């Protein structure tokens, strides 16, 4: 992997990740951009004890542009974009409309491919491995910033999820605090350790799922994907490395080598689970793509027991059947009590049925 760091016209950082060591990245950003002005603020909820980012400047962010005006495509034929080069492998840059900025953290955009019409599932194993390298490198770099407490790499896909740019891309949030979801995991981790005389909760969850077998979706030598026993979403899969590590930087070479094959197969199964159509005519390519969120859970940077935390990826869709979405209604949004219409065992069986031939 070759890494090239440069700056956009407004001073934001842009990083190219290339598979070839002899790739030269010399193009400059020729757009007449004003300096980025953000108003990001972290406010703490006194009742719930969590944090909310207030970011009013995001009201003006780019919203569903036509494909020929996509800001994440390479700069070609005189059309200037966020990426000055005419081509790229993987590109990462500071978000122009960040939810977190300055002392409140940092937000970055990760462009997986220059192909506007592709998706992560369309990548080759080598391309997926390069994205993993980029996630890992950014996790290491962002973890060194004094204001950053946790690094979150994720992908939102699909208009149903709320994606405003159709180009295949993900994001990285570097939070100035440990997120509420992770805090709850750490609390459960400590309680389990106390109750079992030192056993690790993540290790036990993975061992129990592998022993039961009913919710396993696929396994490799170094990774296991399963639908959790108490899945919140209709189709939700957790992907764990067999060897517990706290974050992406700690994965060994064997796990890194196997990851692309496992993850690409998992994403392709997600695209097949609703492939029978919705009864309203021929399916379009976009309709065949299941909307999802893919979220890497990593240990907080300076947590006292970070070595006990287990890196894992959670992949889920809000689609429950063809043409029908799982909306967060009163119980979920008002009280954070999820109601799942699809039994986890049935979801796992469906995801096994659509395995690649």
Region locations from a protein language model:
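Substrate-recognition/cap regions that form aromatic- and gly/pro-loop-enriched pockets
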Residues: 271-273, 277
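Active-site microenvironments that recognize anionic phosphate/pyrophosphate groups
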Residues: 1-167, 173-246, 251-254, 267-268, ...
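Acidic, glycine-rich loop-and-strand cores that form catalytic or ligand-binding grooves
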Residues: 261, 265
């Amino acid at each position: 992997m070759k890494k090239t760091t440069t700056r956009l016209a407004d001073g934001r950082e842009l990083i190219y990740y290339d598979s070839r060591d002899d790739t030269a990245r010399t193009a400059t950003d020729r757009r007449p951009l004003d300096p980025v002005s953000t108003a990001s603020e972290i406010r703490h909820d006194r009742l719930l004890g969590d944090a909310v980012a207030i970011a009013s400047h995001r009201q003006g962010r780019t919203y569903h542009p036509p494909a020929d005006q996509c800001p994440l495509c390479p700069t070609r034929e005189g059309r200037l974009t966020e990426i000055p080069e005419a081509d790229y492998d993987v590109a990462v840059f500071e978000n122009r409309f960040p939810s977190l900025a300055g002392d409140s953290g940092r937000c970055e955009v990760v462009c997986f491919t220059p192909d506007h019409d592709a998706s992560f599932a369309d990548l080759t194993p080598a391309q997926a491995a390069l994205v993993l390298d980029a996630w890992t490198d950014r996790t290491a770099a962002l973890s060194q910033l004094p204001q950053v407490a946790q690094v979150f790499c994720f992908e939102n896909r699909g208009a149903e999820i709320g994606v405003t740019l159709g180009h295949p891309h993900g994001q990285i949030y570097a939070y100035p605090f440990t997120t509420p979801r992770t805090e709850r995991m750490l609390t459960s981790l400590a309680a389990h350790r106390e109750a079992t005389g030192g056993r690790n909760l993540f290790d036990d969850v993975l061992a129990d799922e592998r022993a039961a077998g009913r919710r396993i979706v696929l396994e490799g030598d170094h990774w296991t994907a399963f639908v959790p026993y108490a899945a919140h979403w209709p189709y939700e899969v957790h992907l764990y490395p067999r060897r517990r590590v706290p974050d992406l930087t700690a994965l060994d070479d064997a796990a890194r080598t196997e990851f692309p094959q496992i993850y690409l197969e998992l994403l392709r199964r997600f695209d097949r689970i609703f492939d029978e159509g919705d009864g309203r005519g021929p399916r379009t390519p976009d309709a065949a793509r299941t909307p999802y969120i893919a979220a890497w859970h990593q240990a907080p940077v300076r947590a006292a027991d970070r070595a006990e935390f287990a890196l894992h990826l959670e992949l889920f869709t809000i689609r429950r059947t063809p043409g029908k979405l799982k909306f967060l209604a009163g119980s979920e949004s008002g009280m954070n009590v999820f109601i799942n219409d699809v039994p986890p065992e049935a979801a796992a069986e469906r995801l096994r049925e659509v395995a690649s031939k």
